[in-house]
């Protein structure tokens, strides 16, 4: 052994000895690797439990005065290395409220049965695969949990994301506080679109069968990298809700974290022509916003008018060359000659005329939103048979958009996990304690201005009679007569 005094060296030597004993009975590296990981995780889980107990003992020995010992409780947390079991000391403060020094020091959420690392793993995994598969991935070399536990982790993460996004929107649009940003760009590209997914419990005739996830993305142009064109520094945001929530939260929380909102001068906004897709300008009042009709939607609409795609591409070439009005006239002529499908052609003609000022404008290349909806949200939420609740779909969309933006999905804190009932019980105990103290304080009654100190004045240079009258009057005022 190289160094007997180094804990890391001793641990490595102990593992090497255990792995050697395993290797002597194995015929393949695959079996050895699997057993080595399982053995290592079991040892790590047990060692982590012992370390937590040692830290608890240290904190208890240095606890604040006034805490009295109540009991020692067993605790088990599911983690990425298996179940971590340990004992935790519980104390009571002067108000009769429970105090856990270890949980307070390590910010362990109330009532949780999952470690923060395992919860983070489940949220990340469930954003790619089903809840059942995410649970199996954790159980491969860690703790076993139910799919319902994975769903609870997603719900919690989605709720925390929504709270942060809403707080960012209020801070910007109500309080006028511009968020701190990572970079500065004078010109941005933005795109917005909606995508639909199946709704749970839509068997009733009057129940909606589909829900819409509204999504937006902002990026600082495109660049060639590795033989492909990539968008630069994307900021994503998506939810199930109103356009107002999408834009206010998306601009304040997602875009505002990436780009300094006060420095943005021009925005190229792409969309399919829906009214809500054009609304970004309302939330970026200092920027000049130019709306571009998404070329993908133009191509898709014109191609749907013809059985022969060659005719469609002839019209699209005219559009791309700048002849928007000429292309519409050509499509009308094809309709009159019976070369185009009547129903589709009439709809597309109306669509193109209604957006004629936003077709084939000068500016950077856009047209990425349709593929984004498929590759970010559709690949998880619509790629295999499943249906979503409104809240579940919104939570998933928020989490996926955060992941793709490189932003951290918030975890549950001890303070945030208290809940209204726990908070109310604690406040009740504290109030009862202070009420029983009696005479510990006196609230001075006043009207309008809160507490006012007794009236005083310098009477040393006043005549005795006048000084007496002034002091008497002030005393009467102090007594409230």
Positions of predicted regions on the chain:
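Short secondary-structure junction/hinge motifs that connect adjacent elements
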Residues: 29-39, 54-65
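Catalytic center-proximal scaffold of phosphoryl-transfer enzymes
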Residues: 1-49, 90-481
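An N-terminal low-complexity regulatory-tail signal and nearby short nucleic-acid-interaction modules
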Residues: 56-111
